[in-house]
């Protein structure tokens, strides 16, 4: 049975039917508690975590006759071993996969000693979002991003908002077949300035993400990646050639949290953040702050010191509010005071741009000049951007340079 797709970001939830039509339903505002009863009332089936070694775009029908092939595409970033074994090198798991088997992400399959991507061009969800929803606050404020996702992930986060995408096998989801050129055409048609690879983990569809970004550039549309940062150096360096920005979920400073709550490791994510800095790719960090699990002030301090020491004070950091979801429905919503305290800790240690997220209307969602303290990018409810007091990447009040991607 094919599954419904749930796309969750802050206040919006989109329920995508597994058939050819789609519908959207709106959850109560995040200021209200979302009960399990309300969640189940949306008609979304549950998905189990299994770890083993046509939609509409901006109101337009997305055609599947895009010239894209239904034949699985050979993966990049792997090596052939003896006895028809292969080793995938797209992420730090470096899965060794036997003939007929799949890697941890369940999107890469060994067929007779050749590794294939099962999700190349298989778009399981697409939507047009404000770039602030990703969130990117220093990338083309107020712009739109044509957002795409496939099945699969190389983590199994217990709090995943989009678990029905990330924890599903490709064959369990209804998807449409799109070529990179078709993705670009849909981005243009929707009025989007960007293509965003998001919702699930783009690392598992690195080949498609790269090709979409390259095709987009040829038409003047740039791409951004929304990722957990669990990616090896070679694919990251390849992506850096064609993307405008990369958002990393800095899920915690605790190694234990990574191991027990995400199923991954912390240090490879830290290496990705440092590597992005060296590659010159604009990077923003997001910390989903979960009560009792990663809201320890000592960890905030360690995170702040690491950021200052390794990537510097200019990287934006977003502390976003957790809402009970997936396997962590027993936990409460994050108190706003916790997010504010985290923001204070990082700013006290010299990080210039620290944001409070998932709290619509909070002043901590706006951008303030580190020179004069004035509000230079005003943000309100629903990802809206108000007045922008900047000129050519500088503060309109005092002239100090504000780091970011302000034009392309």
Regions found by a protein language model. Name each.
Residues 110-245:
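Conserved Radical SAM active-site core
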Residues 382-390:
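Short linker/helix segments within small regulatory modules
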Residues 16, 21-30, 59-87, 93-149, ...:
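N-terminal [4Fe-4S]-dependent radical SAM core
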Residues 88, 157, 369, 395-398:
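Short cysteine-rich clusters marking metal-coordination/redox-active sites
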Residues 166-167, 202-204, 229-236, 246-263, ...:
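Conserved radical SAM core fold
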Residues 22-47:
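N-terminal secretory signal peptides and thylakoid transit peptides that target proteins
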Residues 188-215, 257-270, 287-302, 308:
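Conserved glycine-rich "GG(E/T)P / GGGxP" loop and the immediately following alpha-helix
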Residues 267-328, 339-355:
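Conserved C-terminal portion of the radical SAM core fold
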């Amino acid at each position: 049975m094919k599954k419904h797709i749930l796309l969750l970001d802050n206040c919006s939830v989109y329920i995508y039917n597994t058939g050819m039509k789609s519908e959207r339903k709106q959850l109560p505002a995040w200021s209200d508690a979302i009960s399990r009863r309300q969640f189940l009332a949306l008609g979304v089936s549950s998905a189990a975590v299994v770890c083993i070694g046509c939609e509409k775009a901006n109101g337009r029908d997305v055609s599947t006759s895009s010239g894209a092939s239904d034949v699985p595409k050979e993966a990049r970033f792997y090596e052939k071993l003896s006895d028809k074994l292969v080793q995938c090198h797209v992420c730090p798991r470096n899965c060794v996969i036997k003939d007929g088997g799949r890697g941890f992400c369940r999107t890469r399959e060994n067929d007779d000693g050749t590794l294939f991507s099962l999700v190349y061009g298989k778009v399981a969800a697409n939507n047009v979002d404000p770039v602030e929803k990703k969130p990117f606050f220093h990338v083309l404020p107020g712009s739109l991003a044509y957002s795409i996702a496939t099945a699969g992930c190389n983590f199994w986060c217990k709090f995943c908002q989009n678990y029905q995408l990330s924890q599903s096998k490709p064959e369990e989801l209804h998807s449409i077949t799109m070529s990179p050129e078709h993705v670009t055409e849909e981005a243009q048609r929707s009025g989007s300035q960007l293509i965003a690879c998001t919702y699930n983990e783009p690392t598992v569809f690195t080949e498609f993400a790269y090709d979409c970004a390259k095709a987009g550039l040829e038409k003047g549309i740039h791409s951004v990646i929304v990722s957990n940062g669990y990616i090896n150096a070679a694919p990251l360096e390849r992506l850096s050639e064609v993307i405008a920005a990369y958002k990393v979920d800095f899920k915690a400073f605790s190694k234990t949290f990574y191991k027990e709550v995400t199923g991954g490791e912390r240090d490879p994510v830290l290496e990705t953040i440092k590597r992005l800095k060296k590659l010159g790719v604009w990077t923003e960090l997001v910390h989903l702050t979960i009560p009792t699990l990663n809201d320890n002030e000592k960890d905030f301090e360690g995170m702040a010191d690491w950021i200052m020491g390794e990537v510097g004070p200019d990287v934006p950091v977003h502390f976003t509010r957790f809402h009970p979801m997936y396997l962590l429905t027993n936990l409460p919503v994050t108190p706003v005071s916790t997010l504010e305290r985290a923001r204070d800790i990082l700013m006290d240690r010299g990080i210039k741009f620290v944001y409070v997220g998932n709290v619509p209307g909070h002043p901590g969602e706006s951008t303030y000049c580190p020179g004069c303290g004035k509000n230079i990018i005003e943000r309100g409810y629903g990802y809206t951007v108000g007045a922008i007091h900047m000129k050519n990447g500088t503060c309109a009040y005092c002239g100090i340079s504000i780091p970011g991607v302000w034009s392309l």
